[in-house]
Regions:
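Short S/T/G/P-rich N-terminal loop/turn motif that feeds into the first structured element of a domain
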Residues: 1-160
Length: 160
């Protein structure tokens, strides 16, 4: 399960946490919910390098989240490639894509977040992207930009 919030950097995280940690009702829900999780909570902060956040997407929208960890010595090239891939996916799928790098969380991790209106639109975007010769060609030419085996794709559906 993922909880996401838009903040302005570390100061925004601090201000949000101060407010939440001071709310006894929130803290009792966190304590009760801890038994439902598979492990401790993990904080991440993504600094967008490409794409516009815009308004929060509506309930039922789908975020396809792809992550990878940049190989040592490949940061500049990986960021350029990541931005180009985000732009390519936007042009193929017709959906907004955010690309960013972790400010904290897994060191060197980059993330692409593609937002679709619903599950049908997410399926269509994925099919269009995977059927693109340009997209597949760029993936095939990725070289040593990322650590082998570090790629991961997940899906998040907005419920509220």
């Amino acid at each position: 399960m993922t909880y996401a919030a838009r903040v302005d950097g570390l100061a925004g995280v601090h201000a949000m946490n101060a407010q939440l940690l001071g709310d006894t009702e929130y803290m009792s829900k966190v304590t009760a919910g801890a038994a439902l999780g598979g492990g401790p909570a993990e904080d991440n902060l993504l600094r967008p390098l490409h794409g516009e956040l815009g308004d929060p997407p509506p309930a039922g929208s789908v975020a396809t989240v792809t992550t990878a960890v940049v190989a040592n010595g490949a940061y500049a090239d990986a960021v350029v490639w990541g931005i180009e891939m985000a732009q390519l996916v936007e042009s193929i799928a017709g959906t907004p894509t955010i690309f960013g790098m972790n400010a904290f969380g897994t060191f060197g991790q980059v993330t692409w977040i593609n937002i679709s209106a619903d599950t049908a639109a997410a399926d269509a975007a994925g099919e269009a992207t995977n059927n693109s010769a340009d997209y597949m060609g760029r993936l095939s030419a990725i070289g040593d930009l990322f650590l082998p085996g570090s790629g991961h794709r997940s899906l998040a559906i907005r419920v509220a």
